[in-house]
Amino acid sequence: MQSTTNNNTNKKNHARSNRSDNLSTVVSNRSAYRSASKSASRSNNLSTPGQSRVISYDDDITSDYNTYTINDYIDDPTTDQNTVNDDEGNIYGGNFFDGFIPTSNLFADNYEIKKLDDVIARTNNIMYGGRIPEDQIISTESNNIFGIKDFRVTNTEDTNDDNSNSQSVNSRTDSDNLSARNTSISNSLLTSGRNSASIRNANPLLVRNATSLGNSERNSPDRPSTQGDSSIRGEADNFSGRNASARNSASNKNSASRSSVSNKNSASRSSASRSSVSRNSESIKSSSRNSESRNLESNKNSTSRNLESNKNSASRNSASRNSTSIKSDSKNSDSRNSQTNKSKNQRGGLSEIKGIPVTDKFIGQNEIPTSSLGTHQYEPNYSLTSPGSIISTSSKLNNEAIRGINNRPIAGKNQVYPDTITDTNDLSSFFANTESNTIDQFGGQTSDKNNSTKSNTKYNKSSRKISEISYGTSKRSHNRSSNTSNLKSETDYDIFTANSEL
């Protein structure tokens, strides 16, 4: 035991005599430590190459085996025993940092810590890894500290911003959608046309928007661009507006109330020569029953219906902008059909199938769409042009009827369609398998599979006669009602069922 004590004393004296040359000499005697620090400060041996250092910059206390050169003793942090060698000792894992937790290369030597007299500056250097300019300490760990700090702050800020923006955007989106729906239903025809494009993919049988219809007609090389194109778009817009107003009716499940709301718009369009009767419902006998009989129902007699029919007929024939099913005696040069109209091939089409509004043309089997390239290029999708309108997918409509529907061309493809349709009897395939003796809800005739007509109690022959005159149809036009009279009540079928998101 005595020899061990003497040996330790000799080692300490040897350390004191060489402290100016070896900064790694650290003893437990604080006076000797302070002398070594002052000597290092004067000679700046810390940065001198070849000198033994307290800790090298590539060492880490978390590694399995780190050697820190020191004289005096060996410190094993796992035990309480110190082992002394003859020449020098090695410390395995751990170091003396004057009470500081040892970290890799941060304040690796006590001298760098002791030179910071200000406690606040010293604390800041420990916290920020030497970011204070006047007391910068070289440390590879400072970058890691910055990275962790920045990473956490960035994540927190990004998460908050994303959540905030997401909620705000969702709120604005809901508000905009609601506003767009209100605008479409209430006033703006343009907005209604734009919104119709958003429902193109909702159902393969949903209609295309009115804009594509207008563009396709405008691309026709065999007819100049006239006001008739705008008139076509107007039809679809007005038609959509009428449906929307009917949908917003306070009692939209009541057939009389729905008819009352929609007929107001119908009457105003008639006075402005954009009458809805110009769209020519095949299943309704006259314009009076199309625009006025829904209001009147059975409350008006046949005389008042005839008067309304005469009024609408005069308005349509005198200043019609969309002479849909009127003969070519319309005098307006901008009439859509005035350039290619024929008595047999007049523009017409079903405006209601089973209570569902329809405003597109129908091309029969003998009329093949053509294009400027001479090939039969047309879209295979079966769609109509009125926003919100659909074709009933009832099993009563056979496949032949579906194939008979001509799709409107997409704008910009230079596809040309003939400006005619076949006679209305070619549409009989739509109703080939329908039930017999179906009653027309508007007071029309009933029909069976043999097209034998029966007079309904609400039907008036004088009204039928006037309707034939006002329509100006061909010799077979009186058969329209018998082929298309099996309408379904609007109270039984909601025209917006398949498009509840509009």
From Swiss-Prot:
Start and end residues of each stretch annotated as Disordered: 1-57, 155-181, 212-362, 438-487
Keyword Iron-sulfur annotated: no
First-listed, main subcellular location of the protein, grouped into a coarse class: virion
GO CC aspect terms: virion component
Keyword list, A-Z: Virion
Subcellular location field: Virion
Domain of life of the organism encoding this protein: Viruses
Transmembrane segments: none
Name the record gives this protein: Uncharacterized protein L452
